[in-house]
Amino acid sequence: MINGEQTMVEDELPDQGKPMSDESADIDIKDLKVGESIGSGAYGIVYRGTLFNSDVAIKKIQNEKSEKNEFIKYLKREVAVLKNIQHPNIVQFIGVYYEPLASPSLVNRLLNSSSTWIVTEYIGGGNLHERIKDTKKDFPIELRIKLSLDIALAMAYLHSRDIIFRDLKSKNILIDDSSSPIRGKVCDFGFARILNKKQQGNRHLSICGTDSIMAPELILGMEYDESVDIFSFGVVLLEMILRKKVSKVLERGPQSAFEIDQDSARQLIPDDIPVLYSDLALDCIKYQPEERPNFSHIIHVLKQLTSLFPVVHTFDNPLSPTSSPITPRKNSLNSPFTKSMRMNSFDFNLSNIVSSTSVQNNLKSQNLNFTLLNLNQINNQDLNENNNNNISNNINNINNNNNNLNDCNSNLSSSTSTIYNDSQQTIIDEDELDKEEEENRNKVNNLKEKMLLVMGEFDIYINKVGKELLLVSEEDHISQKYDECRKVIEIKKVLGEVIESDMSNSQQSNTPRKNSNVTNSRVALFLKSMERSLNEIYSSSDVLKQRIVKEDDLVESLLLARVVSKIKKIHLSSLDINN
């Protein structure tokens, strides 16, 4: 029990998810200054400090003898993950320091240290849990969506590097309010797991994390993959939507196989929450792992939402790179303000210049017979010259206008001829369009024949595979059918993407209702999942065939042909689905 939250851990495979070495990450304790405590996490206390006069966060982890094995695994996992990742939405790792015992051993400093200090960048905006809980402060939907996207980007990065986080919760999301806009950052990788792709067969992964955000398959001790992080992500989204801890408002337990009831969750969602956002959260917490979206899809949806609900960049943050708008320097000779001042500050009328007493005295001292009358005469002469020039210009303009009129008459004659020629060309173009439409209809009909032929072959395949999968009665058989199971899941996903809008009537039954009479064995859960997936494939396949028959547009038919091609590639493959 850590900080009032249950954490479950089991033994793992040897050396899996552990670092090769952490020597390169060592820091000198002399350069590190420890300040006040700012929080606590699993296995340690977090302090604010400085390293080379820069603010840092220091997690000091005590080496408890009673939990030595768990501590070593926890610590090695965190250092291994942090050392090998770098992302703008993940807290940046700086280094590690092992505090030695009274008589340190040079053989293994980790085992013979009284505590270990993990140093990361300092994020001063608190964590997401605090922001959600403090209902007195405004938490605009724009910011919730922005932070959701930040988390999703971080998780997609981790999954691309074969890392399962396994403890994604609002307390592990720090808010960086020194950037503009505010940015979310994932932290605390003590339960993260680096997958070993060379390991074949069943994955005997450990059970760990905080049970209130854990996926059902993780709690039940079944095999799991990256989709457990997607479930936890959905819980975090729900907490941001409800501004409450999900475990306190939605009941989940053994009687429901630890499912979060979708209908109950939907009833709690406020009316002002965008439907696209709430639907995404509910999709992520679906009971069956294969029904949850991946982070690529999640990011796509959240980017759509951020375009609809953008976060406004503020300029009140002195640390923000966008805090000071670029303005021209006040002493710049080329600035619009300076140019305007220069032009408006001078009067070029000579009479105004000479009318001043100082200028007249200066002229007299130089024996210049320059009077105001002379100046007025000069000004009048200039005015007359300007008027004469204007008259000449007007005469030229009249002549030009006459020439333009003659040109217009000529253009009118040529336009009449062009209109006749265009009408002839239009008739030719219409004939060509008719031919093109006929060709497109023939192409569409050919595509229909080929697609329906492929779908007929697919029906035979899926009926055969479906019967075999539903006859599974032992856990060993599940492993033997692993390839076909993955094919079923991939086919369902492909079909779901193209006919989702036509399956609205079946959306209400997406999440299975469970009761205490259901056996929660691995085989029972597998059969229920497969039966549901197969039923969705059968329905989706029928809808797809109907669309193929009805579609007359060439572009839409080509899009459907791509879907059919994907389905064929999957069921004919020897399961290289990821390519």
Curated annotation (Swiss-Prot):
Enzyme Commission number(s) of this protein: 2.7.11.1
Gene Ontology cellular component terms for the protein in this record: cytoplasm
A GO molecular-function descriptor: ATP binding
Listed Gene3D superfamilies: Phosphorylase Kinase, domain 1, Transferase(Phosphotransferase) domain 1
Region (Disordered): 1-24
Superkingdom of the organism of origin: Eukaryota
Annotated catalytic residues: D167
InterPro entries for the chain: Actin_reg-Ser/Thr_kinase, Kinase-like_dom_sf, Prot_kinase_dom, Protein_kinase_ATP_BS, Ser-Thr/Tyr_kinase_cat_dom
UniProt keyword list: ATP-binding, Kinase, Nucleotide-binding, Serine/threonine-protein kinase, Transferase
Top EC category: transferase
GO biological process: signal transduction
Family affiliation: Belongs to the protein kinase superfamily. TKL Ser/Thr protein kinase family.
Protein name: Probable serine/threonine-protein kinase kinY
Species assigned in the record: Dictyostelium discoideum
Gene name linked to the record: kinY
